[in-house]
Each structure stands twice: as structure tokens, then as C-alpha cells.
């Protein structure tokens, strides 16, 4: 049986496992700015590197501030993200002559992550400034990033965050209206079961339905109502598969595409479609919380040791 002291030690150990991030952790990223993560924030030996590619992403710092507040130095003075981007470009242009501050700090709930500008391989416009083995996400080409985050439409920041596109512009090909029901009367020799199997079996090969008035092939069935008669009144047959497959060409409901608007430039939102731009999901990369199996294993070993 565990003693009081051993139980206290176990509780402290459990608290540390579940609340302290490991060295493998990184800063808090916004899931809606994966373009910025791919081209701008490299991770190498727990040093977070700022590049002008990251600074290019509109609104990145505004969203990052929603998760971790940027602070400078021991007094935790708030920092403007644009200032850091400016300093990064200035430092890269002339590292030897740079006299400004190069060390910045990013506070999180558990640890302090150092953001440093003085990285020997950093230069403006270079996205793959780290070895690919250290962070594969930094190998993304600049042109690919630019093409993925920009559009031909430019919307002022004061206007709506959505672009409305009428649905008819997305449907250039003609759509034929297919009948959804088959009527029956009293003069045919075909049963309702046969009619159902014939309609269900319509394929690319022409099929013929034989009736007193002649034959109808599958193309005519798809474009004109079909009336098939039988000796006795039959219930109305419905073909929901045809009805559901025929789009409503009369619908003019606009289709909305969510585009995050920052400083007059539209960007593709990687996580939300037709949702508010303020709804941003955040996630911590790595850390002890990211490896629960290790924590559980260590806890079991510790308990076994105490027992």
C-alpha cells in the first residue's frame, strides 16, 4: 500500500507530466495560417526563426497574438508583429551592422520560447533556409505559397468577407430534367415489378420498354415522361435515385466562399468555410501533451517502483 509521502510524490509527478511541455514542443500556431507555417517559421534546436516569408502572410501576427502574446525582454513589453518583421528584414540585409534587438520572447501557458533573428543561414526571400531534415515544411516554394494565398479578387477591408458566386455560373453544361414518377393505367401488359427493374437497370446501353404504343429507348426515358399502362391500377412508383441525381437548374442560391480579408488582400482560409474570420483554431505542436503514451508508460513505471 502506498504511503502518504509516496502518494504525494506520485501526484506531483502526474502534475508535471500533464502540464509541462517537453523540449520537443514549439510555439502556438494558428491552424488557419498553414501557408505561413510552411514557408516562414522554421524549427531548429528549439530556436524559432522569423523570415520575411512569414512576415508576408497577411494577418499572421494578428492571429498569432490571439494564442500567445508576444513580449520583449524581461519586462514583457508587448511587441508589434510588424516591428519584428521589419527588424528581421533589416538584420538580414546587414547582420554585421545591425544594432537593434535580435532576441524576442513569445510567452505561452507553460514555457517561454525564444525567437531569434541572428541565424547564420537566414536571408530575405529564402524559404528553404533550414536543412530539409530538420523541418520538411520549410521546403515549400515561394511561388507555390504566393499562388495559394492570393486571388484575383481584391476586397476592401471594410466590405464583406465573402464573395458571392451565383450557382448558375458553376453549371455550364446542360442538365436534362428526368422524370421522378411513372404513371400507370389499366391497358398495359407490364407489371409494376418489371417497370421497376427496367428503370433501375438503365445504363449506357440502350434499353427498350415494350408497350402497346411502341418502344422507348433509355435516352428518351431520361428526357421525356414515360407512361406505362397495366391491366390493373398500380401504386405510383418513385425513383428517388433519378430525382436526387438531377440538379435543380432553377436554383439561383449563391455559393459563398470564405476568404479571410486582411489589409485589403484576400487569403484562403485553410480551416473554415463560410464561417466568421474570428473563429480561429489553435494547436500546440509537440510537448508532453502530444505524447500521452510516453507519459502513461513513465507513470506506470514510477508506480511500480513505489509499490
From Swiss-Prot:
Keyword Transmembrane: no
Topology within the bilayer: Lipid-anchor; GPI-anchor
Swiss-Prot/TrEMBL induction comment: Up-regulated upon milbemycins A3 oxim derivative (A3Ox) treatment.
Entry-listed glycosylation sites: 146, 217
Keyword Cell membrane: yes
Residue segments, region Disordered: 232-261
Record's keyword terms, sorted: Cell membrane, Glycoprotein, GPI-anchor, Lipoprotein, Membrane, Signal
Subcellular location as annotated: Cell membrane
Gene Ontology cellular component annotations, sorted alphabetically: plasma membrane; side of membrane
Compositionally biased spans, kind Polar residues: 239-254
Primary localization class, coarse: membrane
Name of the protein this chain belongs to: Predicted GPI-anchored protein 44
Naturally occurring in which organism (per UniProt): Candida albicans (strain SC5314 / ATCC MYA-2876)
Lineage: Eukaryota, Fungi, Dikarya, Ascomycota, Saccharomycotina
